[in-house]
UniProtKB/Swiss-Prot annotation:
The lineage of its organism: Bacteria, Pseudomonadati, Pseudomonadota, Gammaproteobacteria, Enterobacterales. NCBIfam families: mono_pep_trsgly. One of its GO terms (biological process) is peptidoglycan biosynthetic process. It holds the Pfam family Transgly. Belongs to the glycosyltransferase 51 family. This is Biosynthetic peptidoglycan transglycosylase. The keyword Cell membrane applies. It is a single-pass membrane protein. One of its GO terms (molecular function) is peptidoglycan glycosyltransferase activity. Peptidoglycan polymerase that catalyzes glycan chain elongation from lipid-linked precursors. The keyword 4Fe-4S does not apply.
Length: 241
């Protein structure tokens, strides 16, 4: 009996230290990545491990980091128009979108709608695993609050664009621009940026180089939203250009 208690005590001790260590690493990551390029994300690690487990040792998950000044303003505008139009104003969470998603999901449980902001998506992609669970969502909330507190909006957008997945093994807008359009991210047109943003909900299902009718329709919707937001002026007014 004593040995069992001692074992449980040791398990609790090391488990607690492990949790504290992970939290410390996350905090350090938030501070470091406020200034330095993010070399890899949890999504990249997942994809890399998945490739190795299937015997694909040629697969290399990486992104070609570029600063915001080397990314077309249309790309920043497109992802905000598509994913998070209130990005410049909220503190990491869009309460209205959350309430709308909850209401929709109660009525239609077969087609679940998300309400994650760009800040939440960035926190998840950099620090957390993929999937749906209350534990992961709770951690996402804490990490989102952390990056909103430490990072600028421009920094969050820069990190997001550099680690977002645009296709199988294609991470970051620079790699996507060169792979799909044979040009650097700085030269992307409004139409090209909207097409890249259109596949972001599921880049392994939706294809930039073979867009379905849905993707084309979404691209056109994003272009209209970009115009309604005010185009490049929207970025300038919110110091995101």
């Amino acid at each position: 009996m004593i040995s069992v208690r001692r074992g449980l005590s040791q398990l609790w001790y090391w488990g607690k230290r492990g949790v504290i260590g992970i939290i410390a690493l996350w905090m350090a990551g938030i501070l470091i990545f406020a200034f330095l390029p993010v070399p890899f994300s949890m999504v990249m690690i997942e994809r890399q491990l998945g490739a190795w487990l299937t015997g694909d040792f040629a697969y290399v998950a990486h992104s070609d980091w570029v600063p915001m000044d080397e990314i077309s303003p249309y790309m920043a505008l497109a992802v905000m128009a598509a994913e998070d139009q209130k990005f410049p104003d909220h503190w990491g969470f869009d309460v209205g979108a959350i309430e709308s998603a909850l209401s929709h999901n109660q009525r239609n449980q077969k087609r679940i709608r998300g309400a994650s902001t760009l800040s939440q998506q960035t926190a998840k992609n950099v620090f957390l695993w993929d999937g749906r669970s209350w534990i992961r969502k709770g951690l996402e909330v804490g990490l989102t609050a952390g990056i909103e507190l430490i990072w600028t909006k421009r920094r969050i957008l820069t990190v997001y664009l550099n680690i977002a997945e645009f296709g199988n093994g294609i991470f970051g807008v620079e790699a996507a621009a060169r792979h799909f359009f044979n040009k650097p991210a700085s030269k992307l047109s409004a139409s090209e940026a909207a097409l890249l943003a259109a596949v972001l909900p599921n880049p392994l299902r939706f294809k930039v180089n073979a867009p379905s009718g849905y993707v084309i329709s979404r691209q056109q919707w994003i272009l209209r939203q970009m115009h309604q937001l005010g185009g490049k002026t929207f970025l300038q007014e919110n110091t995101l250009d």
